[in-house]
A protein has these predicted regions:
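A short, well-ordered alpha-helix in the C-terminal region of glycosyltransferases
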Residues: 326-340
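Conserved donor-binding/catalytic loop of nucleotide-activated donor transferases
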Residues: 116, 252-254, 270-279, 299
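An amphipathic, basic-hydrophobic alpha-helix
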Residues: 66-97, 115
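Active-site-proximal region of nucleotide-activated glycan assembly enzymes
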Residues: 33, 41, 55, 114-171
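Conserved nucleotide-sugar phosphate-binding/catalytic loop shared by glycosyltransferases and other
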Residues: 3-10, 28-81, 221-223, 306-308
Length: 359
């Protein structure tokens, strides 16, 4: 029996790429040969994926939302080129299954996969489906979502996660031995979150020294110097870092996280069982980060504080009112939302669909 081949399509942001990598690594562990379809350099996927040992294919196609009428005018020609490039990739790779995890790059290749009778599996990470997945869901063989009631007929399985997030102790086990100041983790993401980098030091400065938590603040590489200056000006001690190497462990060690509300972050926090103050990125497409956060907040797993109305005074007052008993209760409610079988569900769908194909 020849080795099975899968083509994984994902690109644009880490919210698509990292779940795609979780699926790709699981497929490879089961003996699949995995190729990745993304945008050419200097894309994020081109930087991350080949370094993990996956064959990389590229199609030149970019998003059009919010780009103006000139970009829309060229869309038909760009689509035709992307269709032709996608067909060439599909004929060269000859996958038994094509797996799409969102991002504009998956649209032309997904449509051509269906045209060439390739089984198509989709996974949507956000609580509001992106344009590519909204289109492809109508013709895909299997559709999975990270949140409930996102796409009609889809199966709610959560987001694909790296194993480390599933191996942490329960909230009750973690909180049991803790004492002293609360442990606060502020996560700005790979690019940083300037609003958090500015607001959090100001809020902490409004707390008396004995009220302040132990702070670890991740800023993003480009903002670390400005963050150091902000904490120095506020007179607040904190551990500042541009990146977090082991996010799962960092989440598990925190009593509380302040963060944006990207789909992967929300899923990882519920998988570990950590309460969070969510400050959604206000310019996200379709305001999907607010919808992501509400899913957890309405279940009691955290708090939603929109950026447009958030002040240092309001954040300081919120922090002042928290204790470990309250945080443990919210952590357990977040834990109750965890979905840990998403990767296995996607891989199982690939196995089933591949059994009915020969090339």
């Amino acid at each position: 029996m020849s080795r099975r081949t899968a083509l994984v399509m994902a690109g644009g942001t880490g919210g698509h790429i990292f779940p795609g990598l979780a699926v790709a690594e699981a497929l490879r562990a089961e003996g699949w040969q995995v190729h990745w379809l993304g945008a050419p350099a200097p894309s994020m996927e081109h930087e991350l994926v080949p370094a993990r040992g996956f064959a990389f294919e590229s199609v030149a196609f970019s998003g059009v939302r919010g780009k103006g009428w000139q970009t829309l005018a060229w869309l038909p020609l760009k689509l035709l080129r992307a269709f032709a490039q996608s067909v060439a990739v599909l004929r060269r790779v000859r996958p038994q299954v094509v797996v799409g995890l969102g991002g504009y790059i998956s649209l032309p290749a997904g449509l051509m996969a269906v045209l060439l009778n390739k089984p198509l599996v989709l996974h949507e990470q956000n609580s509001v489906a992106g344009m590519a997945n909204r289109v492809l869901a109508r013709v895909a063989d299997r559709v999975f979502t990270a949140f409930p009631q996102v796409l009609r007929g889809a199966e709610w399985v959560g987001n694909p996660l790296r194993r480390a997030f599933l191996q942490q102790p329960t909230p009750a086990e973690r909180y049991a031995g803790r004492s002293g100041p609360l442990r606060l983790l502020v996560v700005g993401g790979s690019l940083g979150a300037q609003a958090l980098n500015t607001l959090v030091p100001q809020a902490l400065a409004l707390l008396a020294p004995e009220e302040r938590p132990l702070v670890t603040h991740q800023s993003g590489a480009k903002q670390i110097d400005a963050l150091r200056a902000a904490y120095a000006q506020a007179g607040v001690d904190a551990t500042l870092t541009p990146f977090i190497d082991d996010t799962a462990q960092a989440f598990a060690q925190a009593d509380l996280v302040i963060t944006r509300a990207g789909a992967s972050t929300v899923t990882e926090l519920t998988a570990v069982g950590v309460p969070a103050v969510y400050v959604p990125f206000p310019h996200a497409v379709d305001d999907h980060q607010t919808h992501n956060a509400r899913f957890v907040v309405e279940a009691g797993g955290g708090w939603l504080m929109p950026q447009y109305s958030l002040s240092a005074e309001a954040l300081a007052a919120h922090l002042r009112g928290l204790d470990r008993t309250t945080l443990l209760a919210h952590a357990e409610r977040a834990w109750g939302l965890r979905q840990i079988h998403a990767t296995a569900a996607v891989v199982a769908a690939c196995d089933t669909l591949a059994s009915g194909t020969t090339s």
